Amino acid sequence: MKKTLIIAEAGVNHNGDLNLAKKLIEIAADSGADFVKFQSFKAKNCISTKAKKAPYQLKTTANDESQLQMVQKLELDLKAHKELILHAKKCNIAFLSTPFDLESVDLLNELGLKIFKIPSGEITNLPYLKKIAKLNKKIILSTGMANLGEIEEALNVLCKNGAKRQNITLLHCTTEYPAPFNEVNLKAMQSLKDAFKLDVGYSDHTRGIHISLAAVALGACVIEKHFTLDKNMSGPDHKASLEPQELKMLCTQIRQIQKAMGDGIKKASKSEQKNINIVRKSLVAKKDIKKGEIFSEGNLTTKRPANGISAMRYEEFLGKIATKNYKEDELIRE
């Protein structure tokens, strides 16, 4: 089984504060995640002045500002990107960022990013998909809100414009913050695998870590999860994010699950082998048996340990003649 890649999604939980963004990088690195991911955008390039906030954003941000005003406060400029990439390198964690507009695609490409993460909202954005495809980079494509037809169309655009199909990973996702458990539909991961024959992961917007863990057990090769310094901070995504200790627990338990998946061959494990003779049973004298007596249900039984004749041969011995004397509880040796 491939190692599951863990993307710790800082997103916009830095609240526009570069020092907080650096702290989030340190938390992600300490947790054991493989990547820390931010979001790159020029708000005016991707949000019109008429765009309304999503219902979850209305609950977690000021009601007297537009979506554009809310998002403008969360922008990271070129200098900030460079500082964060350098800080991630110092912390020994890979840097990712999701571009939300064409200008930001160029910015991330110029900064040398090797992997481009396409968010669910851009899966129907033709100019955006074509631009990323032409970079011929590895792509992680989130599929929240999309049906199989829309995903197929996006894949066709990517592959016809320069992206290599084998370099694309799909992420199943439910685009709601937090996502209701009854709408997660983890079985859709298998539907994506069957339909497109690509690696499939899961972008988790539920509360807690257990749904991500279930996704790993179902074969997710990537897990993406939002995290924050404090869920009670002001901002659109904090409430649906993990706090540092939860992120660390997620990473630890994902690694444990991966070890537990094994190779699928059913056999006694190395640690079990020493217990075979201890917990299995052998043929034992139920009471004293004299030489020449016939073994019967009345004088023959099965008990631990298993270093005698296997209890599976019980019926084979019924009716046989004992060739020696046995004391009660003595292992049968014939």
From Swiss-Prot:
Disulfide bonds: none annotated. One of its GO terms (biological process) is bacterial-type flagellum organization. Keywords: Bacterial flagellum biogenesis, Lyase, Transferase. Residues 282-334 form the AFP-like domain. SUPFAM superfamilies: AFP III-like domain (SSF51269), Aldolase (SSF51569). InterPro entries: AFP_Neu5c_C, AFP_Neu5c_C_sf, Aldolase_TIM, N-AcNeuraminate_synthase, Neu5Ac_N, Nonulosonic_Acid_Synth, SAF. This is N,N'-diacetyllegionaminic acid synthase. It comes from Campylobacter jejuni subsp. jejuni serotype O:2 (strain ATCC 700819 / NCTC 11168). The lineage of its organism: Bacteria, Pseudomonadati, Campylobacterota, Epsilonproteobacteria, Campylobacterales.
